[in-house]
Amino acid sequence: MARVKKAYKIITFANTTAAMAMESFCLENNLPGRLIPVPQEISSGCGVAWRVPVEDYDLLEVKRSQMNFAWEQVIDLMM
């Protein structure tokens, strides 16, 4: 039986420090998602990305102005 792929937003970062800051920020603010290795389909600076279901992405976008680190890219990907 084949696994059904789901739609995700993949957020990449220029460095691992920003990726770890994203994880801490999301845990402290009870925001969805998790750190993953950057998928092969994507090229990224640090090799670590944040994966969040598409339906939950708006929760992150609302809090983005409170984050003191930068996102590199936001990519839609079926995984």
Please report, for each region that a protein language model flagged, where it lies by residue.
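Short, flexible, solvent-exposed loop/turn segments with mixed acidic/basic and small polar residues
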Residues: 1-2, 36-41
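Short proline/glycine- and acidic-rich turn/helix-capping motifs at secondary-structure junctions
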Residues: 40-46, 76-79
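Short glycine-/aliphatic-rich beta-strand segments at the starts of folded cytosolic domains
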Residues: 2-12
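A short linear hydrophobic-aromatic micro-motif
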Residues: 32-38, 72-73
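Short aromatic/hydrophobic contact patches that present stacked aromatics
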Residues: 10-12, 47-51
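Short secondary-structure transition/capping segments
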Residues: 3-4, 46-48
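Short amphipathic alpha-helix segments
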Residues: 15-32
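C-terminal structural segments of small proteins and small subunits
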Residues: 51-79
